[in-house]
């Protein structure tokens, strides 16, 4: 595929386009935080990004989100765009992020593009400490231990009624990319049509109210694909690369949500009086706002250092470590922002309560902080 390298002028123009979309169309649709966007509205807004070229669902790479992760300016665009979208709607940003990654994988493997999704978790998380060994073996050729092989084959099996995968997305999609790990083949990718799957809509677990958790499993009698979609030696590299981009995207979306919560709290503290002075002049409020601001700025600094594509386990482990450290801080920042508003901060029409729930939900996607820490620790033992 021919690469489309961005110039700094291209980057500025694309970011301006996303900013304008977020401040107008997306802001209008999310003006009432206690009333999540209906799926039809969310899908229509995704369609606008497709029309603008911000999201690319064609079979040729262009300048859309995650079109060329080898281009540092394209990575910078993706991260800034996701932050901008998340400032208005973290759930919308997450949908766009996952859809862009699925389109990237489709283009990379020569598969048709479309309203695809990609799942980058097993049926029970990441496989804990077994995951790094399988990825290291991809690069070094080292054999996977029998214990790790058994754990990975269980966690990353094809979705069944007993071991389903979970998709958090809009309800209308046609195909989903599923990675599996098989003892005799290692990493494999399967592009499964919705018609071959049982899709069960679930109740909202916590945050990202714009999207629907969906439990997916193969229909009875459906024979899994006999051949891998992409060559065996490429499958694990695709998993390594997409896992890194997925984590980088979450590291962009969560600060966008926390920054919005902080902005609401800062504005409130600058107008609310208690005992005479504005509450921003009270030490307790200043402490809450200061700590929340530190967490958001720390996340910004960390994100600026993650523009390199994940071509090795070491680089992916860096993202695991950043996520494990930063997601709890960003959740705390959103919580501190909510506390500044006092009792009304818990009211859903204020918006901060939803942003806190969104941050909490983002913390658990793609591995909890505890599991990411375990994976990082295991990587250190292997190299």
Regions found by a protein language model. Give the residues of each.
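Glycine-rich phosphate/cofactor-binding loops in nucleotide/flavin-utilizing enzymes
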Residues: 3-4, 341-383
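Glycine-rich beta->alpha junctions and the first turn(s) of the following alpha-helix
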Residues: 5-7, 14, 203-296
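C-terminal helix-coil-helix/basic helical segment that borders enzyme active sites and/or dimer interfaces
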Residues: 27-37, 62, 296-327, 338-346, ...
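Charge-rich, acidic-biased intrinsically disordered regions
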Residues: 36-47, 280-286, 313-326, 345-361
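Glycine-rich flavin
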Residues: 36-191, 195, 375
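Short amphipathic alpha-helical face segments that pack within enzyme cores
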Residues: 76, 80, 100-104, 253-260, ...
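Amphipathic alpha-helices that form helix-helix packing interfaces
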Residues: 251, 258-261, 265, 292, ...
